[in-house]
C-alpha cells in the first residue's frame, strides 16, 4: 500500500502546522483562492502518492535540470513525498537492466493508475534507431508504457512540439508525443525548458484534484499559459510609450527600454515567465537584458533569427507597427496633457471664485 503525502511528511517529523502551511503555499503558487486550501489538505491526507514513470527520448535533459530547481514546491518534496517517482533513468539510483526491471514491475502493479511523464521525443525514421533505450528503440518503449498510463505529461518543447531536433529538414523525423500517442489524455507543458514551478505546479494540481487543469486549445494548462509574456512584462510601459532598444549597446538598452525591435518574441509567446519568473522568482530573460526567443511556442526554432523583430502583429492589445507606437504615444500623451491642463485651469478658476465669494460674505 502506497503511503499518502501526509503520512510521509509525518514520518519525516514534519508538524501538522507546517503541513497546513505547505498546503496554503501550494494553493497560492497555483493561483487558487483560500477556499481551495481545505481541498488540498484533504487530498494530501487521503490520496495515496501517485506512481510516476518519467521517460527520456531525444532531449538535452534541460527539463529535468529545471524541475530539480523548483522553489515551491521543492523538487525533493515532489519526488520523495508527493509522488512515487519509480522510474527516471536520470534521477534514479538503479541503471541498466535493474532500471528496466523496475519499469516493468511498476507497470504491472499499477496498471491504469500511473502517470507517464515524457521528456524529449521519439525519432520515427529508420525504425526509431536514432534513440535506443535498453537495446530497443525509444518509440517502442514509449508506446509500451503509454498503453496502460492513465494520463501523459509532455515536458518541454521537445515532447510538446518537436523542438530543435525536429528542425528542418528533420532527418531523424523527430515527432512530438501527441502525434504518436493518440488514444490517451495528454497535457503539454512547453518551454525550453519549462519553468520549474510550472512543472511542479502541474503535478501538484493533478495529484490534488485527480484531473488535468483547464487546458487551452493546444493542450496547455491555462493557469500558466493563458497570457503572453508581453501582457505582464515590466518593460510594457516602454512599449506603449514608443521607447525601444535599437541596438544592444545604445542608451535605450542601458535605460531598460522595450526589446521588441531587437527581436523580443514576448508579444506572441504564451508563458508565465514575466509573472512566475525563474530561479525562485529571481528574474527572467527580458529582465536580464535579452529578448524572449519564444521557446514555448510551436516552431520557434524554424522562424528565423532570434534577433529579427516581429512585424505586422495582428493580436488584440498589440500595435501592428512599432514605428507608429511612438508617434501615437506622443499624440495621446499630448492630448492627455492638454486635457489635464484644461481641467486644472477650470479647478483653479472655480477655487478662486469660491474664495472671492467667501471673502465678500465675511465682509
UniProtKB/Swiss-Prot annotation:
An annotated GO BP: anaerobic respiration
GO molecular function: 3 iron, 4 sulfur cluster binding; 4 iron, 4 sulfur cluster binding; electron transfer activity; ferredoxin hydrogenase activity; hydrogenase (acceptor) activity; metal ion binding
Annotated transmembrane regions: none
Topology class, membrane: Peripheral membrane protein
Cofactor: how and how many bound: Binds 2 [4Fe-4S] clusters.
GO cellular component, one term: ferredoxin hydrogenase complex
Reactions this protein catalyses: H2 + A = AH2
Top-rank taxon, per record: Bacteria
Its EC number(s): 1.12.99.6
UniProt KW keywords: 3Fe-4S, 4Fe-4S, Cell membrane, Iron, Iron-sulfur, Membrane, Metal-binding, Oxidoreductase, Signal
Localization per Swiss-Prot or TrEMBL: Cell membrane
Family named by the database record: Belongs to the [NiFe]/[NiFeSe] hydrogenase small subunit family.
Protein name: Uptake hydrogenase small subunit
